[in-house]
Amino acid sequence: MALFIFLILVGYLMGSINSAIIVCRTFGLPDPREEGSKNPGATNVLRLGGKQYGIMVMVFDALKGILPVILAKLLSAEPVTVAFTALAAVVGHMYPVFFHFRGGKGVATTIGALLAFHFVIGVMVAATWLLVANFWRYSSLASIASISLAPFYSLILVGNLNIFPPLFMITILVLYKHRDNFNRLIDGKEPKIKFKHSVIEEIMEASPATSAEQEFPGKEVIDTNIDETEKTEQAEAVKKPKVKKATTKAKKTTSKEETTKKPKSTKPKTKTVKEKE
C-alpha cells in the first residue's frame, strides 16, 4: 500500500510539470493558456511557435508518462499499480498543482505512459494517432480515436482485466477534455493541422531552409518550402542590386561623354572672335 501511494504521488507530481508553459516562457512564445486554443499542450504550441517547439513539448509530455511508469516497474510494482501510476501522471498533466490546475489534454503523456507500460500497445496507439491525423488532419479527432482504442488494445495484447479500469479512466478523462473539440468537429469549425506535406513527413523531415542556412551562414538563401510565386519574388529581390549597379555605371559613362563633348563646342566660338579682329 505504501508503494502504491508513493508511485501515485510521483506520477501526479511529474505530470504536473507543464512543459508547454515552460517552453513558451523560455523561448518567448505567447502563453498557451491565453492564446490559440488556450490549451497548454503540444498542438497549441505547434500553432503558436512552429514545428520545433511543438515537437519539443510533445517529447517532454511523453517523458512525464514514461518516467513514472519505468520507476514503478523498477520497483517491481504489480501491473495494476503500474497502470494507476500512468493514470496519476495523466491526471497531473490535466490538472497540475504547480499551474493552478489548468493543464493540457493528456494525449502525449498517455502515449508515453503506454509505451513504457507495454511497448506494443504504445506503438499501436501512436500509429493510430498518426494515421488519423495524416488522412483527416484533425489533431483532436486523432487523439480521440487513438486513446479510445487503448483499453481494447490492452485487452487483446495483455489479457489482464485488472488493468482495464485505470486505462478506461484515462480514456474517459481524455474524452472529457476534448468535449469542446467534439462540438467544433460536429459544427465543422475545428481547425485542421496546416502542413504542406503529410503529417508523417512533417514530423520526420527537417525544414530545407534551416539546413541551407546552417551550411551557408550569412548568405541569402531562397526557401524551397514555399510556392512558386514566393520563389520568383525572392529571386527578383536578389537580382535587384545588380540592376542598380548597372544603371549607376551607365550614368557615369553618360556624364563622362558630356564632359568630353563640351570643349569641342567652345573652340569654334574663340576662332570666330579672332577673325573679326
Curated annotation (Swiss-Prot):
| Cellular component terms per the entry's GO annotation | plasma membrane
| Catalysed transformations (reactions) | an acyl phosphate + sn-glycerol 3-phosphate = a 1-acyl-sn-glycero-3-phosphate + phosphate
In its keyword annotation, does this UniProt entry include DNA damage?
A: no
Q: Which family does it belong to?
A: Belongs to the PlsY family.
Q: Name one GO biological process term.
A: phospholipid biosynthetic process
**Gene expressing this chain:** plsY
Entries under InterPro entries matching the protein = G3P_acylTferase_PlsY
Membrane topology term reads: Multi-pass membrane protein
- Principal cellular location given in the protein's record: membrane
The membrane-spanning stretches of this chain are 3-23, 55-75, 79-99, 111-131, 155-175
- EC numbers: 2.3.1.275
Which NCBIfam families does this entry report, sorted A to Z? glycerol-3-phosphate 1-O-acyltransferase PlsY (TIGR00023)
Task: Please tell me whether the keyword Ribosomal protein is annotated for this protein.
Answer: no
EC main class here is transferase
Q: Which GO terms describe its molecular function?
A: acyl-phosphate glycerol-3-phosphate acyltransferase activity
Pathway(s) per entry: Lipid metabolism; phospholipid metabolism
Query: Residue spans with biased composition (Basic residues)?
Result: 240-253, 262-271
Function description = Catalyzes the transfer of an acyl group from acyl-phosphate (acyl-PO(4)) to glycerol-3-phosphate (G3P) to form lysophosphatidic acid (LPA). This enzyme utilizes acyl-phosphate as fatty acyl donor, but not acyl-CoA or acyl-ACP.
Q: List where in the cell it is found.
A: Cell inner membrane
Q: Which organism is it from?
A: Legionella pneumophila (strain Corby)
Query: What protein name does the entry list?
Result: Glycerol-3-phosphate acyltransferase
- State the source organism's domain of life: Bacteria
